[in-house]
Amino acid sequence: MLEFFELLLKNKFISNIWRYVLEMIDQNISDDLLDKQQLMNLFTIYFSLIDDGNTTISLDEKVLKSKWQKKIEAVSEMLMQHEEIDLSQIDQIKQMSNICIDQQYLSKINEDDLSSVVGSNKIFVVSNQWLYLRKYDSAKRKIAKAIGRLFTKEYNNSIDFDYRKCTKDDFDLSKKQQEVVKKGINKNLIITGGPGTGKTTCVLFLLIALLENSDKNYNIYLVAPSGKAASRMKESISSTLDCVSEKYKKQNRKLFSIIDNLQQFTIHRLLEVDSKTSRFNYNEKHQFSSNSIFIIDEASMIDICLFSSLLESIQDDSRVFIMGDKNQLPSVESGAVFSALLDSKMLIKNGNIIELDESRRFSKDTEIYALASAINKGEQLVMAKDKWQDYKQFKIEKTDRKKCPIFYYQYVNSVSENKEIINYICNIWANEYYRELVKKATGINLDDKKRLDELYEMSLQGKILSAENLGYCGSRSINNFIKNMCVDKSVSTDVLYQYPGQIMMINTNNKVLDLYNGDNGIIVTLENSSIAYFMVKKSSLIQTEDGYRENRIFKIGEYLFYPLRLISQDEIDLAYAITIHKSQGSDYNNILVVLPNRIGHPLLNRQIIYTAITRTKGNTYILANQELLQKGCDNRLIRDCNIFQ
């Protein structure tokens, strides 16, 4: 019964985690059922599409065939790029798919014909001719219910707040930012906007308005899907406080003490995972107090199940402000919840959605602004042929970073030459941005605070962003190349194969160590010591007092030092290059964007290109070619999740 699954697995159409589920379904469906094989193949297609982030599939033959055909084309292109394609097997997949994706079989996926696996308490649920795993159907219903109860309420606060009374003379909010403050006093809001549009800025002034004019003792939670994104939100709020006048701060010491001491949370840390049951301690039955304010950032990164868990833990009278960029990539896991919220007719009608469209990071005369705007509108990219340079002309440009220029370098048609191109460019990049890190990170003096700051800033000067993790265009291959080129292997540490100067990123939430997915830092050694430490800039609950502690976690200023041996080596990765997904919520002074080099690749799409280029604060280098870039911009990633249907 799993022949089709094995074929898809061999050709990278599906992940192996579905094997057990399909075996369980096979056991639950009677062998006497005439069409069992075709139904099993349909369920296999569904799981394959879940791997792409969908939560549901249509039981309409025409719609499903169109969706599946796009996946076949995309995976085939990816296999060609990696030189792993077997055309005869792709043809076999097409033939088997054409047989099972037929209305006569699709119409049998219902509670009557398949009562053993379809129904309210079974593996699958069918709703309005769409098939869901029960957990996704449950999550979408909980989200719709929570949005209904949290975003239809009006708060009758008769507050007349003028932000100008608390800011310095040279500070202004845009009209849309002022609308956020004014509306947010009496409504919960969804706020969308690109980088530099001031989402966090206007929410800070909204917070000031609510705290200044209320006798409620609010519990305020800064929440994001990753540790990095949560830290960035706290940093953004702290930096925006510089716009507030000292006079106003002195008049409202208690208010600003609250804001200064706000804590940031990943969603997992906020909801508290029970170590025994692996379930969240905060949930529908045990909610946060109603005098709570939730500021949720990078919402596009939150998957459907996590979004559901977060919203159901919030009481009706709570204040909720959800922020994100509608044009960024959706979550790594299934769903596209933030996008669905922005399309909600109820939220639009009720005035809960505000889009900020004035960027203070990218002025309208910059190349980045023009390219990002064209990408989002799906426009034809107009650029002169001489814009695309040969890779041998690659160099680190010494230009005015405020102009955010873009430099384009092109692939050729040969795979072997493209590998050489990537290595050639990464060699120059590493010499500029990573080689000096090795000296700076070896034998550091903890009393030299300036050196710590310089080291951390150096690690952020240049970042390589890749669409994929595997393959010669992928972050893993690039990271290994740069490590072998840069590290000094004569400097041994107490952790095998780990050396000072390596840029690293945490890939798993670790509550015990207070390290979270997305936390990034550098491996360092101290004077006269071979102990390797992971140095990361973050606040932490587990170590709040300054001072060196031998062989233990310690804090110096804004930096935490973790003995690297405390961190499981499968929980931390090299991060000279990271995937574009991982880069969400971050920005870097200079970026090198390495795109897939085949048209039709599943990771060559509008959202991934937009997300990548908007991580820059300065120079952007793109490795692709004109046709690849245009085709990627034309390909908009669409996920089926049907939250409000």
Language model features by range: what are they?
Residues 84-159:
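Interdomain "pre-motor" coupling segment immediately N-terminal to P-loop NTPase/helicase cores
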Residues 519-645:
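C-terminal accessory regions
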Residues 62, 143, 266, 297, ...:
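Residue-level signature of catalytic and energy-coupling elements of molecular machines
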Residues 327, 331-504, 510-513:
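Conserved helicase motor core of P-loop NTPases
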Residues 178-181, 186-399:
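ASCE P-loop NTPase helicase motor core
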Residues 289, 315, 496-500, 516, ...:
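Residue-level recognition of short, solvent-exposed, well-ordered loop/turn junctions
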Residues 1-82:
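Intrinsically disordered, low-complexity N-terminal extensions of AAA+/P-loop NTPases
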Residues 125-195, 204, 210:
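Pre-Walker A segment
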